[in-house]
Amino acid sequence: RDSLGAMPTSGGTFTGTVRFQQPTYFGGDKTYYITADGTANFRKVYGAVYNDYAEWFPRGCDTKPGDIIALDVSSQTERYIKAVGKMDRVVGVHTDEYAYLIGGDTPDEKDDNFKANIEKYIPVSLAGRVRVRVTGRVKTGDLILPSGTPGIGRAACAGEFAPAECIVGYAVEGDDRTDERRIRVRVRG
């Protein structure tokens, strides 16, 4: 089998911690590592081709990718639902494009994180660009607000006041369509 030093170039199993060290300009080493429990420490990550940073939020209703999500202020427990109208406390968008997804419950070793959490939590985009469900004409740069249809957004009208808690983000693309579709929005964050 081919190897690079003590590490095989393919196959095999590592146990414990794999460390990468790099000498620093001022002496000493900068250490990066991956542990057997899944913890990783790196200075930079490249190649994440997806568009946003997301967190699992407690689910209060059925949602689908692109839905605008808000805190359910009628509940005494933390849960999140589809935003509607100028609803307070918009938190983000149900995403299926995340580069990073944090939170949720720790799955059993053999379980997939997504499958273990999707029934109980919503993957909500907190920062970055994500495709949002909208209706009506949208121009690049328009602020996106919840519409009167739960989970669906719309472009703010010229001169319309919207509290910061209601703003989803701004459109980074636009079109003249009026049907329901998904457009890319830079979520506030």
Q: Residue spans of the language-model regions?
A:
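Fibrous stalk/shaft segments of extracellular and virion attachment machinery
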Residues: 1-35
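Extracellular receptor-binding modules and their adjoining Ser/Thr/Gly/Asp/Asn-rich linkers
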Residues: 35-189
